[in-house]
Amino acid sequence: MTISSARTARRLPDLTSSAFLVIAFLTGIAGALQLPTLSLFLSTEVQVRPFMVGLFYTGSAVIGIVVSQILATYSDRQGDRKTLILQCCLLGALACLLYAWNRNYFVLLFIGVLLSSFGSTANPQLFALAREHADRTGRGAAMFSSVMRAQISLSWVIGPPVAFALALGFGFPAMYLTAAVVFVLCGLLVWLLLPSMPKTRVKSAATLESPRQNRRDTLLLFTACTLMWTCNGIYLINMPLYLVNELRLPEKLAGVMMGTAAGLEIPVMLLAGYLTSRLGKRLLMRLAVIAGLIFYTGLTLLNGSWALLALQLLNAIFIGILAGMGMLYFQDLMPGQAGAATTLFTNTTRVGWIISGSLAGIVAEVWSYHAGFVIAIAMLAGAAVCMWRIRDV
């Protein structure tokens, strides 16, 4: 009996860690089924102009920041992240049901986006819970986080091609219903498998160190990550419409490009997690900026299908390092506040969507989808300035 109990105890951490990986994959799938086709959905199903498409992304980001910041503050001070993640998954499923059958732009913008914001917040909360679990069990936080990020990338290998196949072959309702089922399954696994870690009040200065000591570096990192995510947002908004309307390439190519980049991100994330102790997060983030500059320059110069696919290696390096190392960089600068640090990093994505939504819509309306990539190059130059001024930690 004693031997059996000991063996079970040894297996439990592995089961829990595996559950984190599976749930990270499912939350990634839920997002990867919706985001790649959103601009196409708004322009063809809801039938709005490019400016309104950009406005939708901007409004979505603003609401998302408010929701995630409120939940992050609550989760860092009290409550149980497990319950919060479960509730977010169920609200995400409700959002998918609304998108499946409603075609009123403003209903989608306000009610749909509010529900979706809760759904998307499940992901940063999952990573915050994983960080706490890794710290408690003695696992390497950097490598464990990189493996979880790799699950997100794996979901994006599968999600975008499936999303375009469902949307173009069976209609957008089928695509959104599939995403709703994934959210429900994710919530079920959270309820059954994730550990509960209720908050306890700890007043140790070592564990609750104020991030104000690193205010300058946190601000520089926030600015750099925001600019980098803005470029990615412009790419994700413009790219499907750019391929179809300006390059006259097949719609499904967008899904293939996204899936290819996501597949290449997996080894990039794992390698970055392995190298972080040797090279440091700052150097890796600088490499990401350089890869991004070359990638967006290539987008402005090349227009063949195979050339665009080949460029995805640079895109994978850019996003793979940013997604994996950026969050850990914030957590290092804000010790004892895993939820706030993780959500602050997530909010760089959302602020990026605010900027990219506005820019992508206006630039496409006034000039072209192609011009958005030129603006991305200038933004990456600004991100490079920030990354070359920030200190290593």
Swiss-Prot record:
The entry's keywords: Cell inner membrane, Cell membrane, Membrane, Sugar transport, Transmembrane, Transmembrane helix, Transport
Membrane topology listed for this record: Multi-pass membrane protein
TM helices/strands, residue ranges: 22-42, 51-71, 82-102, 107-127, 152-172, 174-194, 219-239, 253-273, 287-307, 308-328, 344-364, 366-386
Gene3D superfamilies: MFS general substrate transporter like domains (1.20.1250.20)
Entry similarity comment: Belongs to the major facilitator superfamily. Set transporter family.
Induction (free text): Activated by cyclic AMP receptor protein (CRP).
Top-level taxon in the UniProt lineage: Bacteria
Listed GO CC annotations: plasma membrane
The name this protein goes by in its record: Sugar efflux transporter A
Compartments reported by the entry: Cell inner membrane
NCBIfam families reported for this sequence: 2A0120
GO molecular function: carbohydrate:proton symporter activity
Principal location class: membrane
PANTHER family: SUGAR EFFLUX TRANSPORTER A-RELATED (PTHR23535:SF2)
One GO process term, biological-process aspect: D-glucose transmembrane transport
Function, in words: Involved in the efflux of sugars. The physiological role may be the reduction of the intracellular concentration of toxic sugars or sugar metabolites. Transports IPTG, lactose and arabinose.
Name of a matching Pfam family: MFS_1
